[in-house]
């Protein structure tokens, strides 16, 4: 049994021991700036927090995404206030038309606050946008896990299932 790397490298969790090995969150100021970018495009993301819950306020995401979150979804009146009280690991909108996400993804990339992944979604149809802290990715999470466990492999084999795995698969 090996730990799971989750939220595109933002979280590594050992389910066997029920222990978080590491997590990388946004600063509270980054949360505000990222939300401003989403709002400027008329979008409201879901926020994945370090407390294992997902927060949303009238989220712009697919019905399937909300159903998949299930009872871990907490609806709030104000994402700005919520983002100042929690450690946010990931902003997410899944299963939407490309035209809804292309420009916000570019603005997030240009901001220097975030590492957005925009990809064709095979599960929820349409396209999905996940946003990790700057310089955080599935590959950086793998490298961080290797350092955390003092593991020095001669090579690493990875398996991907979505467009947000491409960077990891090219290493």
Model-flagged regions — what are they?
Residues 1-65:
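Active-site phosphate-binding/coordination module
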Residues 37, 41-43, 48-159, 163-168:
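Conserved acidic, metal-coordinating active-site core of Asp-based
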């Amino acid at each position: 049994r090996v730990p799971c790397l989750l939220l595109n490298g933002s979280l590594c969790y050992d389910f066997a021991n029920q222990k978080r090995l590491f997590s990388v969150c946004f600063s509270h100021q980054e949360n505000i700036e990222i939300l401003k970018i989403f709002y400027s495009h008329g979008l409201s993301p879901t926020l994945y927090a370090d407390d294992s819950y997902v927060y949303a306020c009238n989220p712009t995401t697919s019905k399937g995404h909300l159903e998949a979150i299930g009872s871990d979804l907490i609806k709030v009146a104000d994402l700005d206030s919520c983002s100042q009280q929690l450690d946010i690991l990931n902003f997410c909108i899944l299963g939407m038309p490309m035209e809804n996400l292309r420009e916000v993804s570019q603005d997030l990339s240009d901001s220097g606050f975030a590492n957005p992944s925009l990809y064709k979604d095979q599960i929820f149809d349409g396209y999905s946008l996940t946003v990790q802290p700057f310089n955080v990715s599935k590959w950086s999470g793998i490298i961080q896990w290797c350092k955390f466990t003092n593991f020095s492999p001669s090579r690493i084999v990875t398996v991907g299932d979505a467009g947000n795995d491409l960077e990891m698969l090219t290493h």
